[in-house]
Amino acid sequence: MKPKSVSEIREIFLNYFKDKSHNVVPSSSLLPAGDPTLLFTTAGMVQFKPLFTGAVELPYTRATSCQKCLRTTDLEVVGKTERHCTFFEMLGNFSFGDYFKEEAIEYALDCSVNHFGFDKNKIWVTVYTDDDEAEKIWLSKGIPKERITRLGKKDNFWGPAGDSGACGPCSELYLDRGIEKGGPNCATSGTCKPGCDCDRFLEFWNIVFNQFNQDTEGNLHPLKQTGIDTGSGLERVALLLQEVDSVYDTNELRKIISFYEELSGISYEDKTLSEISEKKNNNQQISSQVRNETKSIQDSRKTAFRVVTDHIRSVLFSIGDGIYPDRTGRGYVIRRLIRRATLFGRKLNFKEPFLYKLVDKVIEIYKARYPELQRNAAAITKTILVEEELFLKTLELGLEKIESLVQKTKAGGKTIFSGADAFLLYGTYGFPAEMTEEIVAEQGLDFDKKGFQEELEKDRQFSRESWKVNKVSLMTGLNVDKTEFLGYSSVSGKGNITHLFYNSPKSSNSLSQVDSKLQSSTPAGTGSYDSKQVSSLKEGQAGAIVLNKTPFYPEGGGQVGDIGFLRQGKNVFKVFDTQKENDSIIHFGEVLSGEFIVSQELEAEVEITRRERLKFHHSGTHLLNGALRTLLGDHVLQKGSIVSPEYLRFDFSHPSSLTSEEIRQIESWVNESIRKNFPVETKELSIEDAKKTGAVATFGEKYGERVRVVQMGDASIEFCGGTHVSRTGEIGYFFIKKESSPGAGNRRIEGVCGPAVIETFQNRFSELTESVQNLNLKIKSELGEEGTKILILSFIPGPDEIREKLEKEGASAVSFFRDLSENIATKIEENTSSFLKIKKNLAERDFENNTSVIENVLASSVDTGIGKIVSAIFEDKDPNSLKGLSDNLKVREKNLLVILGSRNSENASIVITCSSELTLKGIHCGNLIKTACELLGGKGGGRPDMAQGGGKEKQNLESAIAGVINEAKQILTGERV
């Protein structure tokens, strides 16, 4: 009987291989460890890469797993085809130097037919184009030759996952689903076989015969031990066994779709659509139109259901593994998935945040297998909600903008959507370039990827610091009341416009560079832009808005300014930066839609996640200052600071660099203050009363009559106007990344707080893992048994272990990870040195004992009648190697004088030795070496039977050796040469 549920299929597979003596290994994180070339875990073999290459000791030789995977290579077709997903589970069985082709093929066929219940007569297989062995095995298992297809490297040579690692030819199993599944994509009208683009044959099992290790330059090297890496997509197997049309119709994914059906009130299989029902039955022509429109809307909605179903899984599992939405890297991919799901959600009439509402229901499906989802449910829900809210603020406006840009492109007779327009949508409306590409493709336009990248690069080149020095003094000469700051207690609030400024470009009006324009503002007449006070700002205009009240924190006290939105109905202003001039808070940005006029009341909304990280780092900076003054002394004065969402930087007066122990003590002091969870109390006092509290003032800072004092228990009390946490425990953890000097008499500390600590350690240990694996591979491949003692077998935590330990133990785990990372780094350095030393010794030993070298040198001998003289010149050999070779030469030949030289990039060295018999004939190596060293411009000396020396004049090495030979001949024969 065929298994029906996804859960049953998973357990049947794992139990099958468990019975075949495979270790059942839990799924690793979606955040891959030790491979910076991979953004995500994309295959089951990723966690086993070092086992295949031999970079680590084998804990077992057989393994099986069900691995959570994330791939976005086919993102644009996800939801539109029956089999593509971004998130999926990969069933796999693995052999590390144990079984190979015969058993792997046997297991695959046996499990497929006798345990999954597939009809053997419907199974086809593919093999690599020249893999006769695999074909022979399949034939022996009863698969006829007509159901075996040979395919090339594109289809049947797999790997590696990432830029390097194990790889090899593969063999795949396909199920023949019948001619009727061929469809319009079948080029042979039903006589096709695997390799055809149609849907008749669906691949459900891939066996990779790992025989090679690919390096980062793409070169293949034979593996010392072969291996097996199989992958069987759980969702695909379920599709075939449940005999449904797509992976989205399998039981677990269909259940998620049902949640969205309930939430939207729209049926996934809707056959009657209200939008067109009024047209039906009027006449045959309209009836045909009705059918076409009905199918179009049905297909569109079905795609939307599939997209949101797939993407919620990807996002949920990623955040559960600590991968949060961000502007770059992995986080950018997650943000992109949320935004794509939000976009498709509109086709299901979702105009408000909706993805977050079903997090708990989706977790319910998977929590037994993946308990980390339940543990992180609150964080997942909150993160998705914040991301949805952020994107929805500009989505409607962005869609309107993209429509107008598409029409402009078409009206101009163009077929390519420009990179500049795409960058405008990216920078201003938050549209990922890939999403824009997908939207314009539906409108029949190509996408200018190169142009977009060029615009992105231009934007990166603008320095944030460069504009502030020359920033327009907007408020000079104006009678302006003080802006009331609301941001200490809220990230949103209402305020009225008191002043508007328009930033007009003199030479360019490209909206795609609006952020850079604002950041490059200069006084009128001295740069490319003019800023002037106006009564209104209209759509597309860059400028600045001053409110009488705002929750936006202006840059000050080291803390960067807030970003976010100002809005009133459909009037939307995107804030790129917030600054303060005199007592006025100025919001710099661009009007995305509508118009803004003086006195208008606006809703001000600060970007929450960014503000949270700023609070962590600002409060962490105060604790750091407290630690420095407590542990180093009261001479410590703050000389400057930067508080950003990503990190903190603190400059302070101190005469010498900090020792490792001092850094450790400072870090521990801050983390202990975090652990104590002090309340963060603020008071506004007169300057005199504030000084009496002992509050620390920033050196050189000017203060008014009244100041704000921030106190954190007995750990810190400072003058500060910035935003902070409510209790120190909210900071989570603190880690010092770097200590350096910004100038004489001052020191600088760069550190991270909160989630940034987790990310820092994950990145650091990933780099260490890669370094250890690469070193171990070198040791094994180049030293063999000689290198066994210097293999690094230290425990290195993976991304999940790092996050879980920090979340469980808090700040105390920071010291553990600091010590561990430093110990591993030291071990790498020491063992690298040992590796090079052993490698050199082996090379010297091989050189000294090389029969061919010995024979060649002896062949050049000069017989004086009393003794023989041999000489040779080598490259990059040290004196010890030359001495070793000399000894072996003297073993082979009696009455021998040996003169050996070597050159490297800087100098030349020379070694002279002789048999004891020749010393009795007047040869003194110590005297001969002096003759040579004079020509080499150096020094030398030694005993009668052995001497060495060298010099910088390496070009004279041949002449030096010739001189020694001549002098030796004269001594031995009594004749002048």
From Swiss-Prot:
Keywords: Aminoacyl-tRNA synthetase, ATP-binding, Cytoplasm, Ligase, Metal-binding, Nucleotide-binding, Protein biosynthesis, RNA-binding, tRNA-binding, Zinc. Its cofactor is Zn(2+). Zn(2+) binds at H618, H622, C720, H724. One of its GO terms (molecular function) is ATP binding. Consists of three domains; the N-terminal catalytic domain, the editing domain and the C-terminal C-Ala domain. The editing domain removes incorrectly charged amino acids, while the C-Ala domain, along with tRNA(Ala), serves as a bridge to cooperatively bring together the editing and aminoacylation centers thus stimulating deacylation of misacylated tRNAs. Belongs to the class-II aminoacyl-tRNA synthetase family. This is Alanine--tRNA ligase. The lineage of its organism: Bacteria, Pseudomonadati, Spirochaetota, Spirochaetia, Leptospirales.
